[in-house]
Regions:
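N-terminal Rossmann NAD(P)H-binding glycine-rich loop of SDR-like oxidoreductase domains
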Residues: 2-27
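Structural motif
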Residues: 6, 74-75, 118
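SDR active-site strand-loop-helix element
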Residues: 10, 34, 79-80, 119-125, ...
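Mid/C-terminal beta-alpha module of Rossmann-like enzyme folds, strongest
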Residues: 14-15, 203-246
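NAD(P)H-binding glycine-rich loop region in Rossmannoid oxidoreductase-like domains
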Residues: 33, 39-103, 110
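Conserved Rossmann-fold NAD(P)-dependent oxidoreductase catalytic core, especially the SDR/UDP-sugar
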Residues: 87, 91, 102-152
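Glycine/proline-rich active-site loop of Rossmann-fold NAD(P)-dependent oxidoreductases
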Residues: 129-133, 190-195, 224-234
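Conserved beta-loop-beta element that borders a ligand/cofactor-binding pocket
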Residues: 162-188
Length: 246
């Protein structure tokens, strides 16, 4: 039941992370959230007794403190990302998402939980599945994405985080199971409905839209609904708003 679930949320004040936090609390989930500034939490969220907010730079958090935050959690949800200004795109840390993914999964491995911990990563459609499984992406588009990763550090960071989950955690890890959620172009909106796909459903030239509310809803479903988790564990679903899915 949701009120028996404990989650560590990485990034709880961003546009998507804030929505994930609010939804988890609405469902009765106990949340430990690492945030850069607790002042950015919504008043109704900040005062919730089920929330423990820790102000910290996640990459600078001491190992022992991270272990204590992970200890006893059923899931770790990462909504970390880079700011969209020049400093956020090209400034340090360029490997925020990938390095924190490694740190969190490493902490789980040290703790050796009796049951695998769920790791839910907010990723992007610019991220490729391994071994060219995204067959809709042709050679030209793959080249464009590779160029993007070479020029724009957040694109490489997102790919590195997903590659770590696919290649190093894999499908048979004893302590971590994972899902990498790949939204298309993120937009505001109430998130009236969404569609999930195994692979890409649009091209870079004609992207679909994904409301941040829908991303938050699906990520929370993965945490609280065993059926959703069993369907998508170890996979990289693409999520788009239902009205624009193909």
């Amino acid at each position: 039941m949701p009120n028996d679930i404990r989650v560590l949320l990485l990034g709880g004040t961003g546009r998507t992370g804030g929505r994930v936090l609010a939804r988890l609390l609405e469902r009765g989930v106990e949340v430990r959230a690492i945030v850069r500034s607790a002042r950015r939490l919504e008043p109704g969220t900040a005062n919730d007794t089920r929330l423990t907010a820790v102000e910290a730079d996640p990459l600078s958090l001491p190992r022992d403190e991270l272990l204590e935050l992970v200890r006893g959690c059923d899931a770790v949800v990462s909504c970390l990302g880079h700011n969209t200004d020049l400093g956020g795109i090209f400034g340090p840390p360029r490997d925020l998402v990938a390095r924190m993914t490694r740190r969190a999964c490493g902490a789980v491995a040290v703790l050796r939980p009796a049951e695998p911990v769920k790791f839910v990563l907010m990723s992007s459609v610019s991220v490729n599945r391994p071994d060219r499984l995204d067959t809709r992406r042709g050679a030209i588009e793959r080249a464009a994405v590779a160029l993007l990763r070479g020029l724009v550090p957040p694109a490489k960071d997102n790919q590195d985080a997903a590659d770590f989950l696919c290649s190093e955690i894999g499908q048979a890890d004893r302590f971590v199971r994972w899902v990498a959620v790949r939204p298309d172009t993120l937009v505001e909106g109430d998130g009236s409905g969404y569609a999930l796909h195994e692979g890409l459903v649009s091209s870079l030239a004609r992207p679909d839209k994904t409301s941040m509310a829908n991303v938050a809803r699906f990520m929370c479903e993965l945490v609280t609904d065993p059926r959703a988790w069993d369907e998508w564990a170890g996979r990289m679903p693409v999520i788009v708003d239902a009205a624009v899915s193909v």
